[in-house]
Curated annotation (Swiss-Prot):
Belongs to the short-chain dehydrogenases/reductases (SDR) family. One of its GO terms (cellular component) is oxidoreductase complex. GO terms for molecular function: 3-oxoacyl-[acyl-carrier-protein] reductase (NADPH) activity; NAD(P)H dehydrogenase (quinone) activity; NADPH binding; NADPH dehydrogenase (quinone) activity; oxidoreductase activity, acting on the CH-OH group of donors, NAD or NADP as acceptor; quinone binding. Component of the heterotetramer complex KAR (3-ketoacyl-[acyl carrier protein] reductase or 3-ketoacyl-[ACP] reductase) that forms part of the mitochondrial fatty acid synthase (mtFAS). Beta-subunit of the KAR heterotetramer complex, responsible for the 3-ketoacyl-ACP reductase activity of the mtFAS, reduces 3-oxoacyl-[ACP] to (3R)-hydroxyacyl-[ACP] in a NADPH-dependent manner with no chain length preference, thereby participating in mitochondrial fatty acid biosynthesis. GO terms for biological process: daunorubicin metabolic process; doxorubicin metabolic process; fatty acid biosynthetic process; protein heterotetramerization; protein homotetramerization. It catalyses: a (3R)-hydroxyacyl-[ACP] + NADP(+) = a 3-oxoacyl-[ACP] + NADPH + H(+); a quinone + NADPH + H(+) = a quinol + NADP(+). Its EC number is 1.1.1.100, 1.6.5.10. This is 3-oxoacyl-[acyl-carrier-protein] reductase. NADP(+) binds at residues 11-14, 34-35, 83-85, 147, 151, 180-182. It is an enzyme of class 1 (oxidoreductase). Homotetramer (in vitro). Heterotetramer with HSD17B8; contains two molecules each of HSD17B8 and CBR4. Does not form homotetramers when HSD17B8 is coexpressed, only heterotetramers (in vitro). The modification N6-acetyllysine is found at residues 40, 96, 194.
Length: 236
């Protein structure tokens, strides 16, 4: 299979799990991360036909050059997954402006930039994009006002883009995870939080990855937000 899947934030967590599933299906992977060595290690684990790239998605020049390099070495990108993200938990009155901006730039602007860069070739050939959001973007949460704004904005952006490019055979969807075992949640006390989750546990990155791959490959779904949270939204 010659189709190419670019996974931004593909060196760890949900992004890495998506890359593993897509590699198993025979797609060629571009593993993109800020840390090139970690990205290379992930690409190496997947096998010889996959490549690693360094990119700071908050920088327009980085995104543009990364897409040029991916297309040069792998070919046009057919699937795009935006799984890169950061969080700076803090009550708004205590949140530094630079922390607000870093979350906005990575979680929202970065995804806008990668999606726009992908359009250059996808408009000619079609494609599928999945942006990894968060249940917090739908529910909100104390101490995560800035983070929630970025993830809520991601949903509005993705739905709008889905409308813009549907006639070009480009689909855009969102996966909104709840509490998932990743680096972002490892500091949380699971026993305290899981009592509010109907399924009684945190999810695994691979479980979210299956949802991402489902949306990537589903030809008649676009503009959808798929919640993967063990039923957490039912308790709101």
């Amino acid at each position: 299979m010659d189709k190419v899947c670019a996974v931004f934030g593909g060196s760890r967590g949900i992004g890495k799990a998506v890359a593993q599933l897509m590699a198993q299906k025979g797609y060629r992977l571009a593993i993109v991360a800020r840390n090139l060595e970690v990205a290379k290690a992930t690409a190496s684990e997947l096998g010889g036909i996959h490549l690693a790239f360094r990119c700071n998605i908050a920088k327009e020049g980085d995104v543009h050059s990364t897409f040029e390099e991916m297309e040069k070495h792998l070919g046009p990108v057919n699937f795009l997954v935006n799984a890169a993200g950061i969080n700076r938990d803090s009550l708004l009155v205590r949140t530094k402006t630079e922390d607000m901006l870093s979350q906005l730039h990575t979680n929202l602007l970065g995804t806008m930039l990668t999606c726009r860069a992908a359009m250059r070739t996808m408009i000619q050939q079609g494609g599928s994009i999945v942006n990894v959001g968060s249940i917090i973007g739908l529910k909100g949460n104390v101490g995560q006002a800035a983070y929630s704004a970025t993830k809520g904005g991601l949903i509005g952006f993705s739905r709008s883009l889905a409308k813009e490019v549907a006639r070009k055979k480009i689909r855009v969807n969102v996966v909104a995870p709840g509490f998932i075992h990743t680096d972002m949640t490892k500091h949380l006390k699971e026993e305290h939080f899981k009592k509010n989750i109907p399924l009684g546990r945190f999810g695994e990155a691979l479980e979210v990855a299956h949802a991402v791959v489902f949306l990537l490959e589903s030809p008649y779904i676009t503009g959808h937000v798929l919640i993967v949270d063990g039923g957490l939204q039912l308790t709101a």
